[in-house]
């Protein structure tokens, strides 16, 4: 049952991003939280800095506001393919999981390309019956990341 809840959380998370409902994205996280995008090499070496780093829901909301109002980038959409999570139940009601992902980027002109592959390294907690991410570290397989990394992975 827990595995199904985690898989459902991942599906809803991906759908919100893919459907351009970015304003809902921060709601998948606790406050405080950690959201970071990094490379597999940096993650393996324990380097804290990420391509994107946020440690509160407010920072996630600011990122969405910047995407909507301030940043200029070519219109694009993502399509996530998310694998099944490998769970590691933890202490204090927290659940850890690693989940593989693949993201295809679709540009305004219809061009599609493989944008990112990797795994989500998550710590989740139950808040009032709903699972939320306390930590989501997006570990990209490649250290080469397109400069158009605008939308959350």
Per-range role (PLM):
Residues 1-23, 27-31:
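Short, low-complexity N-terminal intrinsically disordered segments enriched in polar/charged residues
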Residues 13-15, 68-75, 108-111:
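Short helix-to-loop capping/linker segments positioned immediately adjacent to catalytic or ligand/cofactor-binding
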């Amino acid at each position: 049952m827990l595995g199904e809840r985690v898989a459902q959380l991942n599906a809803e998370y991906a759908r919100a991003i893919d459907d351009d409902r970015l304003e809902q994205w921060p709601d998948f996280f606790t406050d405080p939280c950690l959201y970071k995008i990094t490379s597999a090499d940096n993650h393996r070496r324990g380097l804290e800095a990420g391509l994107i780093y946020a440690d509160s829901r407010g920072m996630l909301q600011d990122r969405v506001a910047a995407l909507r109002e301030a940043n200029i980038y070519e219109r694009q959409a993502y399509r996530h393919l998310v694998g099944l999570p490998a769970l590691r139940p933890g202490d204090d009601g927290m659940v850890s999981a690693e989940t593989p992902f693949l993201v295809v980027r679709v540009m305004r002109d219809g061009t599609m390309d493989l944008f990112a592959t990797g795994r989500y390294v998550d710590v989740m907690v139950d808040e009032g019956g709903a699972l939320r991410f306390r930590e989501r570290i997006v570990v990209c397989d490649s250290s080469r990341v397109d400069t158009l990394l605008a939308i959350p992975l």
